Amino acid sequence: MSNNISENILSLLNCKVFCLGDLMLDEYVIGTTNRISPEGPIPVLDINKEVKMLGGVGNVVRNLSTLATETYLVSLLGDDSVSKEVEKKLEKINVHKNIIKDSNRPTITKSRFIANDQQILRVDKENTIPISKKIEKKIYECSKKQIL
């Protein structure tokens, strides 16, 4: 491996990359705060913009797709409306995907609330309980197919 970053990035072109990890939706709620809520000592966010993008391993595969790599993804999503949004975003990038659905957990969503260029809150919607043996086996089988 070279010490030259440009050479290292170019070496990724036209190679195959396998990605396994948490696929999620990153949401940014951006606005300004100019007042405090009368209900409690918290700022009131006046929303100017909302942005949703692939997060976790989705961010990795999105970045890899810009390098013309052949990218393979295995991940888990909930069986919910957020998973449909994530899958739509995956359709827009060049990735071979194998998504396993688990109706016992929500699709991970990380919502960041930003006011006046400062993050003031992050809300995580996820199930941190380990996946079932059945789902684990599905992930293993899908991964094996992608690698071989």
Predicted region positions:
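Short gly/ser/thr-rich secondary-structure transition/capping motifs
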Residues: 1-3, 137-138
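Substrate-binding N-lobe of the ribokinase-like
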Residues: 2-10, 15, 38, 42-109
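Short basic/glycine-enriched coil/helix segment immediately N-terminal to the Walker B
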Residues: 12-13, 146-148
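Residue-level marker for buried hydrophobic side chains located in beta-strands
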Residues: 17-19
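Active-site metal-binding loops of divalent metal-dependent hydrolases
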Residues: 23
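Extended acidic/charged loop-beta regions that coordinate divalent cations
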Residues: 26-32
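Feature captures the catalytic cores and cofactor-binding loops of soluble hydro-lyases/lyases
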Residues: 35
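Conserved phosphate-binding/catalytic loop of the ribokinase/pfkB sugar-kinase fold
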Residues: 98-105, 112-146
